[in-house]
Amino acid sequence: MSLAFNLRAIPFSGHTIQSRRGLFPVHESPMITTKPFVAVKCSLTTSTDLMGKIKDKFNGKVHTSLPAITTHSADTPCNLCIIDTLQRLGVDRYFQSEIDSILDDTYRLWQLKKEDIFSDITTHAMAFRLLRVKGYQVSSEELAPYADQERVNLQEIDVPTVIELYRAAQERVTEEDSTLKKLYVWTSTFLKQQLLTDAIPDKKLHEQVDYYLKNYHGILDRMGVRRSLDLYDVGHYKTLKAADGFSNLCNEDLLAFAMQDFNISQAQHQKELQQLQRWYSDCRLDTLKFGRDVVRVSNFLTSAMSGDPELSDVRLAFAKHIVLVTRIDDFFDHGGSKEESYKILELVKEWKEKPAGEYGSEEIEILFTAVYNTVNELAEMAHIEQGRSVKDLLIKLWVEILSIFKIELDTWSDDTALTLDEYLSSSWVSIGCRICILISMQFLGVKLTDEMLLSEECTDLCRHVSMVDRLLNDVQTFEKERKENTGNSVSLLLAAHKDERAINEEEAITKAKDLAEYNRRKLMQIVYKTGTIFPRKCKDMFLKVCRIGCYLYSSGDEFTTPQQMMEDMKSLVYEPLTIHPPEANNVVGRKQSCVSN
């Protein structure tokens, strides 16, 4: 369904772009659609009213049609800003068809090198980023004029413009892309200097720059939305004329809508946490005396991946497998003997419940029955979703990861020498990304065939995202694992060079991080590529999990010893946003930022 609206502010970039017509979506030629259309008036006094009107429309209670609209390329800068705003506020899914139409038209204008895109630095950078992420073939060479700081007049551009260039530079998908590499170097240096010298008087803009610079690729989707909502200031930014052809949803209304949407998702996340805790208790996992209890962590990570209430089964399946994989990994590492660890693998291969006395220990019984009952339940649900049985696949994924756990256990306990390649050839599976993604993907609303799941593309997606998470994890757990005599990629890099020019720990860590970056870019290449066997909706899951790895292991081990995560968990799962009536957001003496019919 489509929602038409008016905006007269750019709530984040602060960069003012005037549009002569401001129609949204954009089409050079007339477009006629019979899709339902809702007009949300500024007379709405609460976000609840606004959400109610939108829900009524989505439920088909309003029957109108969108008239033919003729737009011009001059509207593109304004429309791209609106898309960026919708994405940052986390409500772009309600406007996906309009966004797709705009980006289709923007790509056509990009190919024609229209002045409306290429003459403004902010628009140029934003168009490049939005198009590349969507999968359009856009060359970074078009940004070459901005690649060298010496060629950019910093007296004529502001911090928000540099932010857009910085964000564009983050979409480098190949090591050879010197344009984006150079663009990243100078924009990141410039923005860091702005922070160090306190040169950004706007507090919210200062916080935004700091947030981007800390860990850009570790910004989890919903945490980014929460931060954007916190930094949204309807009274600060200059007005933007927009959307005469659309109805009157003012900037304050959009904020109220986005905040209400966030709170609805948050309530769902709290409900899912209760379901996880109940499942955890039912499985008797809370009685285990060893290992990590990551129920709240898994709920946070899956909630941060996606806020769509309709994807609850995806999040729950993913979270349950984070918990199960972690518990069994800890059992293999510390909780049980080698023989007991082998026993779990044998039980999963056999896939048959036994009398309690035949498991050998209560811990083995609890772990196996937790996997057995959870997988059987998910298999039944997935059968309905997929229209076919996927139980064998789910069991196979468990046999695979447990077999790798066994190999790693044997390797480190027997003190077997490994090369880095030998280690990575199996350890990317044991990080758990593959099993969590492929099982939860069954509930994404996409029919997954054997051809898709057994394809080289699927293997590459799984391997690249897992390599990122594995390598970054190794960097942060290197010291702990060295003390436990369980090597990882960093220790293997050090060992590999002992007969050559010796490298120190810092150099080994840098090499591991570089290898993680290489795999992250390879993952982006597959995800952004169009016409592949997996639809984009599926491939996006791999990118989301990649961000989880970057989030968890950028400066510590947030998974095992969460610190920043505890604060983020509060804001994402527990602390709702306070929503004020739209009128209350108006600044005294300033006209309401709405356009009337």
Curated annotation (Swiss-Prot):
Q: Which cofactor does it need?
A: Mg(2+)
Alphabetized, the UniProt keywords read: Chloroplast, Lyase, Magnesium, Metal-binding, Plastid, Transit peptide
| Cofactor binding summary note | Binds 3 Mg(2+) ions per subunit.
Q: Where is the transit peptide?
A: 1-51
UniProt cross-references to InterPro entries, sorted A to Z: Isoprenoid_synthase_dom_sf, Terpene_synth_N, Terpene_synth_N_sf, Terpene_synthase-like, Terpene_synthase_metal-bd, Terpenoid_cyclase/PrenylTrfase
Enzyme nomenclature, EC number: 4.2.3.131
Q: What is its main location?
A: plastid
- Annotated Mg(2+) 3 binding lies at 473, 481
Pathway named in the protein's UniProt entry: Secondary metabolite biosynthesis; terpenoid biosynthesis
Q: Report the residue ranges where the short sequence motif DDXXD motif is annotated in this entry.
A: 329-333
Tell me the Gene Ontology biological-process terms attached to this UniProt entry: gibberellin biosynthetic process; miltiradiene biosynthetic process; terpenoid biosynthetic process
**What GO molecular function annotations does the UniProt record carry, in alphabetical order?**
magnesium ion binding; miltiradiene synthase activity; terpene synthase activity
- What SUPFAM superfamilies does the entry give? Terpenoid cyclases/Protein prenyltransferases (SSF48239), Terpenoid synthases (SSF48576)
Task: Give the UniProt entry's GO cellular component terms.
Answer: chloroplast
Give compartment(s).
Plastid, Chloroplast
For this protein, what reaction is catalysed? Answer: (+)-copalyl diphosphate = miltiradiene + diphosphate
Q: Which residues bind Mg(2+) 2?
A: 329, 333
Report the enzyme's class at the first EC level: lyase
Residues that hold Mg(2+) 1 according to the record: 329, 333
> Domain text from the record?
The Asp-Asp-Xaa-Xaa-Asp/Glu (DDXXD/E) motif is important for the catalytic activity, presumably through binding to Mg(2+).
Q: Say which family it is in.
A: Belongs to the terpene synthase family.
Function comment: Involved in the biosynthesis of ent-kaurene diterpenoids natural products such as oridonin, miltiradiene, eriocalyxin B and nezukol, known to exhibit antitumor, anti-inflammatory and antibacterial activities. Catalyzes the conversion of (+)-copalyl diphosphate ((+)-CPP) to miltiradiene.
Annotated protein name in UniProt: Miltiradiene synthase KSL2, chloroplastic
Task: Write down the species.
Answer: Isodon japonicus (Scutellaria japonica)
* The organism's taxonomic lineage, starting at the top: Eukaryota, Viridiplantae, Streptophyta, Embryophyta, Tracheophyta
Q: Which gene encodes it?
A: KSL2
